[in-house]
Amino acid sequence: MLSVIILAAGKGTRMHSSLPKTLHTICGEPMLFYILETAFSISDDVHLVLHHQQERIKEAVLERSKGVIFHTQIVEKYSGTGGAIMQEDKTPIPTKHERVLILNADMPLITKDALAPLLESQNNAIGLLHLADPKGYGRVVLENHQVKKIVEEKDANDEEKTIQSVNAGVYGFERKFLEKYLPKLHDQNAQKEYYLTDLIALGINENEKIDALFLEEECFLGVNSQTERAKAEEIMLERLRKNAMDLGVVMQLPSSIYLEKGVSFKGECVLEQGVRLIGNCLIENAHIKAYSVIEESQIVNSSVGPFAHARPKSVICNSHVGNFVETKNAKLQGAKAGHLSYLGDCEIGKNTNVGAGVITCNYDGKKKHQTIIGENVFIGSDSQLVAPINIGSNVLIGSGTTITKDIPSGSLSLSRAPQINIENGYFKFFKKP
């Protein structure tokens, strides 16, 4: 086994946001949680080093995971990546295991498989990337698969600038290596910071062997700006879409479909173009038609859309919800709502038909109220159901009716004013042609 230290102390100034960088989301999930999930898949000893907005990050983490060990970087004294793993006396932060893997919190695309070279190595090692265009990166000079030296681009000679091996920002160390060289680390550089790369240089100077392990570039994309966040999200989306299609989900124009990490599929599902699945959703034996949005809801044995919106806590089972229908905290069981309706805070029973333009008036300006509709109910078009209201089964509601009282089962309900036709009434407003 090994211990994992995740570095998350940076300010993330290039994100231009008051939200801590690591809490920015990738497909609905804060990017920090991706790396924590990977860390816990390989270790029972996970450490998180914080500084900037640490209480906010700690609170977010504790809502999801109780197993993380938190540390605060002493930035005022030991800044930089090397300083992140130092205690007050320059010794490494204590870990449970002899081998330590160091990761960055702003790399949400890292997977257990991508870390395999570092996990399998028993030596001190640095993860490398092979970049076609390494401009802007420090170069790693190799000799017989060992690190000879690490050169910052501004210090590289012409030959070294042609090197395409760069530091991926992940490391595997023996704890005794950290205990030996971390106290020797200094900040005698332009930035006045302690660097993990300098730690490696100290080891090389004393003939320590540092393995150079090449990793998959895509998985080690660092997120330091909104542009890089968007790029990482595109890659994650491709993974989520592929995972869904591997389960048999049919996607029409997959590149137009957005889904988040919390979405799960069962049975035979079809997603048409422009569909958005947000939060923790269950899509089971369902057809989600074009440009529909499903948020934190369950769609089971049903069709939804096109242009429908299932807002949080909607449970749509054995039902049809058509175009321009919005649901919110609604439970439909064997019902139909074909078009142009708002169904909020309601329960609708089997074989009930909701006509076009029907609205559940669930909000009185202060509180939300519930509408309960039984089975075999026909609600005529353009009716309003003013909650709280209870409509029994086998009920017929005439078109244009405003319901303000409970309706017993077996009833016909109407509330329209009589129609009046006034002869020549038009010409009271307009001149005769």
UniProtKB/Swiss-Prot annotation:
Pathway: Nucleotide-sugar biosynthesis; UDP-N-acetyl-alpha-D-glucosamine biosynthesis; N-acetyl-alpha-D-glucosamine 1-phosphate from alpha-D-glucosamine 6-phosphate (route II): step 2/2; Nucleotide-sugar biosynthesis; UDP-N-acetyl-alpha-D-glucosamine biosynthesis; UDP-N-acetyl-alpha-D-glucosamine from N-acetyl-alpha-D-glucosamine 1-phosphate: step 1/1; Bacterial outer membrane biogenesis; LPS lipid A biosynthesis. Residues 227-247 are annotated as: Linker. Mg(2+) binds at residues 106, 224. It catalyses: alpha-D-glucosamine 1-phosphate + acetyl-CoA = N-acetyl-alpha-D-glucosamine 1-phosphate + CoA + H(+); N-acetyl-alpha-D-glucosamine 1-phosphate + UTP + H(+) = UDP-N-acetyl-alpha-D-glucosamine + diphosphate. UDP-N-acetyl-alpha-D-glucosamine binds at residues 7-10, 21, 80-81, 138, 152, 167, 224, 311, 328, 342, 353. PROSITE patterns: HEXAPEP_TRANSFERASES. The keyword Amino-acid biosynthesis does not apply. GO terms for molecular function: glucosamine-1-phosphate N-acetyltransferase activity; magnesium ion binding; UDP-N-acetylglucosamine diphosphorylase activity. Its EC number is 2.7.7.23, 2.3.1.157. InterPro entries: Bifunctional_GlmU (IPR005882), GlmU-like (IPR050065), GlmU_C_LbH (IPR038009), Hexapep (IPR001451), Hexapep_transf_CS (IPR018357), MobA-like_NTP_Trfase (IPR025877), Nucleotide-diphossugar_trans (IPR029044), Trimer_LpxA-like_sf (IPR011004). GO terms for biological process: cell morphogenesis; cell wall organization; lipid A biosynthetic process; peptidoglycan biosynthetic process; regulation of cell shape; UDP-N-acetylglucosamine biosynthetic process. One of its GO terms (cellular component) is cytoplasm. Acetyl-CoA binds at residues 356, 362-363, 381, 399, 416. It is an enzyme of class 2 (transferase). Residues 248-433 are annotated as: N-acetyltransferase. Keywords: Acyltransferase, Cell shape, Cell wall biogenesis/degradation, Cytoplasm, Magnesium, Metal-binding, Multifunctional enzyme, Nucleotidyltransferase, Peptidoglycan synthesis, Repeat, Transferase. Its cofactor is Mg(2+). The keyword Cell inner membrane does not apply. Binds 1 Mg(2+) ion per subunit. The active site is at 339 (proton acceptor). In the N-terminal section; belongs to the N-acetylglucosamine-1-phosphate uridyltransferase family. In the C-terminal section; belongs to the transferase hexapeptide repeat family. Catalyzes the last two sequential reactions in the de novo biosynthetic pathway for UDP-N-acetylglucosamine (UDP-GlcNAc). The C-terminal domain catalyzes the transfer of acetyl group from acetyl coenzyme A to glucosamine-1-phosphate (GlcN-1-P) to produce N-acetylglucosamine-1-phosphate (GlcNAc-1-P), which is converted into UDP-GlcNAc by the transfer of uridine 5-monophosphate (from uridine 5-triphosphate), a reaction catalyzed by the N-terminal domain. This is Bifunctional protein GlmU.
